[in-house]
């Protein structure tokens, strides 16, 4: 589960390009919170702080307690606009979390893909899904889904039905899908082919 990040923001009442530029000159970033049937709230954040957190892994799935004028709101980042040269955060969209569950796009980490059995036999680890869409309990949103693929053999597919998700999470789609495959390069042998050749050599 993601740790809850604590951030402070200030409400803002001036809008438009000129107001946004003035905020950025003052070292602050314009942002907005919307969703859950609520009236959108325009805020500003401290630029260095939000940029620091954005550069950490999986910021877009980070659960945040956002304090605005002494009131706390549970939010999730939705979209981040960056400066095209410096990669400093220029604007952030957040969504309010009021429901018990939230649809999330979460990164997939394939642990041990370089050491997978099929790769050792000359295969190529092909990533089909780098992110998956989950329905998660808002208090149990994972930063990522980590899958150990070290025992994955040649010519096989890793399917969603075989993935154990964190408690409180499920795939949005009920239809089975493929996350990754190990495909053979020319000259690579599957386990069965290797055993057959070894048996023939021993005759």
From Swiss-Prot:
Any Gene Ontology biological process: translation
Q: State the source organism's domain of life.
A: Bacteria
Gene Ontology CC annotations of this record: cytosolic large ribosomal subunit
Question: Hey, what's the signal peptide range on this chain?
Answer: none
Q: Name one GO molecular function term.
A: structural constituent of ribosome
Q: Which UniProt keywords apply?
A: Ribonucleoprotein, Ribosomal protein, RNA-binding, rRNA-binding
Q: Which PANTHER family match?
A: RIBOSOMAL PROTEIN L25/GLN-TRNA SYNTHETASE, ANTI-CODON-BINDING DOMAIN-CONTAINING PROTEIN, RIBOSOMAL PROTEIN L25_GLN-TRNA SYNTHETASE, ANTI-CODON-BINDING DOMAIN-CONTAINING PROTEIN
Protein's job: This is one of the proteins that binds to the 5S RNA in the ribosome where it forms part of the central protuberance.
Q: How does it assemble?
A: Part of the 50S ribosomal subunit; part of the 5S rRNA/L5/L18/L25 subcomplex. Contacts the 5S rRNA. Binds to the 5S rRNA independently of L5 and L18.
Family assignment? Belongs to the bacterial ribosomal protein bL25 family. CTC subfamily.
Its recorded name reads Large ribosomal subunit protein bL25
Identify the species of origin.
Rickettsia africae (strain ESF-5)
Give the lineage.
Bacteria, Pseudomonadati, Pseudomonadota, Alphaproteobacteria, Rickettsiales
């Amino acid at each position: 589960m993601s740790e809850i990040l604590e951030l402070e923001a200030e409400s803002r009442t001036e809008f438009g390009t000129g107001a946004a530029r003035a905020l950025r000159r003052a070292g602050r970033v314009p942002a907005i919170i919307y969703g859950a049937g609520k009236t959108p709230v325009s805020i500003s954040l401290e630029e260095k702080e939000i940029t620091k957190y954005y550069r950490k892994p999986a910021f877009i799935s980070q659960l945040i307690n956002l304090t605005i004028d002494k009131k706390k709101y549970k939010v999730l980042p939705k979209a981040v606009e960056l400066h095209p040269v410096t990669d400093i955060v220029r604007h952030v969209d957040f969504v309010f979390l009021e429901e018990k569950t939230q649809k999330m796009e979460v990164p997939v980490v394939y642990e041990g893909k370089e050491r997978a059995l099929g790769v050792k036999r000359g295969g190529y680890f092909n990533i089909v899904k780098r992110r998956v869409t989950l329905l998660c309990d808002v208090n149990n949103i994972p930063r990522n889904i980590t899958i150990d693929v070290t025992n994955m053999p040649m010519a096989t597919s890793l399917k969603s039905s075989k993935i154990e998700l964190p408690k409180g999470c499920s795939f949005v789609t009920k239809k089975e899908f493929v996350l990754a495959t190990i495909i053979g390069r020319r000259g690579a042998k599957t386990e069965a082919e290797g055993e057959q050749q070894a048996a023939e050599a021993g005759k």
